[in-house]
Regions:
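Membrane-embedded beta-strand positions of outer-membrane beta-barrel proteins
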Residues: 21-23, 71-75, 110, 125-127, ...
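Solvent-exposed loop/turn segments connecting transmembrane beta-strands
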Residues: 102, 133-142, 165-175, 189-200, ...
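Transmembrane beta-barrel domains of bacterial outer-membrane proteins
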Residues: 2-152, 236-239
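Transmembrane beta-strands of outer-membrane beta-barrel pores
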Residues: 25-31, 75-83, 116, 129-135, ...
């Protein structure tokens, strides 16, 4: 049986950043890069150090008597740091003028989730509004709505379909189909966790309180830049799409405290900078990076 409680546990189990409190540190290995500015070859060199610190806080502040409607508030903070070396550039000033660059990203969101039935099957609706920015100011308001229909739920298999609609003029794909498939193999400790378009993982319990995963995940990153040197002046946004392949180990220190360790190879699909609010197809700067090793450490707290 699917209830709001079981649905919520499924989400927090798969995505640590949706738990009450989560903190993660990610270190990316050194890599070579080359870039274009305003369509022209611009700069090449080496990223010696690239790391991220992320903190997430989520708190349900209203639950209806029927337990079918929940309002949740969320706060996000990210610190991202780059260190460059061996740079070869032309005379134009680009988005990363210094050898070391630091960025701060903040976001706050309100999310409404409602569970009902469609064709006698559970369906979960969600609407989320987000305000984000950097240390300079609030920069944008955006949001999305989604619907997820549970097609099948048994002891070994869960299948859902749905759609996500972005309320964001800069979105390249305003409507995204959603599909999830989780299946525990018969007479096996392994299960498959597939979420379109985000991940494909093969998982198994390990030791008494651990879980091991092997697979690939698609992640996106963004932050804002306040640029003051021509040809780029004003507020811009960096968007990066990454494909991470490797292994994950999760450990339950207690029923409420969970640890995370990930290691593998990070492939940057693209890194683009646009004017704030513009679609990423209208980028003014892009750069390519070679594949790099990475690791991530995290710890989260979830009392529910």
């Amino acid at each position: 049986k699917t209830s709001m409680k079981t649905f919520g546990k499924s989400v927090t189990d798969k995505f640590p950043t949706t738990r009450i409190f989560d903190i993660q540190y990610e270190q990316l290995g050194a890599t070579e890069f080359n870039s274009k500015l305003l369509g022209e070859k611009f700069e090449q060199g080496r990223i010696d150090d690239h790391n991220r610190l992320k903190i997430a806080f989520n708190l349900p502040f209203y639950v209806s008597n029927s337990k079918r409607f929940i309002l949740t508030s969320s706060l996000r903070y990210k610190y991202e740091s780059y260190a460059f070396d061996n740079r070869e550039t032309n005379t134009l000033s680009g988005p990363f003028p210094n050898e070391k660059e630091d960025f701060h990203y903040f976001a706050g969101a309100i999310s409404a989730t409602y569970m009902s039935k469609l064709f006698n099957k559970p369906i979960i609706y969600n609407a989320t509004t987000t305000i984000d920015g950097n240390q300079e100011n609030i920069q944008r308001i955006k949001g999305f709505v989604s619907a997820t229909l549970v097609l099948k739920k048994t002891a070994s298999t869960t299948i859902t379909i749905g759609a996500l609609v972005m309320m964001d003029p800069s979105s390249i794909i305003p409507i995204t189909p959603l599909f999830t498939y989780n299946h525990k193999f018969k007479n096996s400790t392994w299960d498959i966790d597939f979420i379109l378009p985000q991940r494909l993982l093969f998982r198994r319990d390990l030791f008494e309180n651990g879980r091991f995963s092997l697979g690939t995940e698609l992640n996106s990153e963004n932050f804002y830049l306040n640029l003051k040197a021509k040809p780029l002046t004003g507020i811009y946004e960096l968007n990066q799409l990454e494909l991470k392949s490797g292994i994950t180990y999760e450990h339950r220190f207690s029923a409420k405290v969970h640890g995370l360790f990930k290691v593998g190879i990070n492939n940057i699909i693209n890194t683009r900078i646009t004017e704030r609010g513009e679609r990423t197809t209208k980028y003014v700067y892009e750069h390519k990076e070679n594949p790099q090793a990475y690791f991530r450490l995290g710890i989260s707290y979830n009392p529910f």
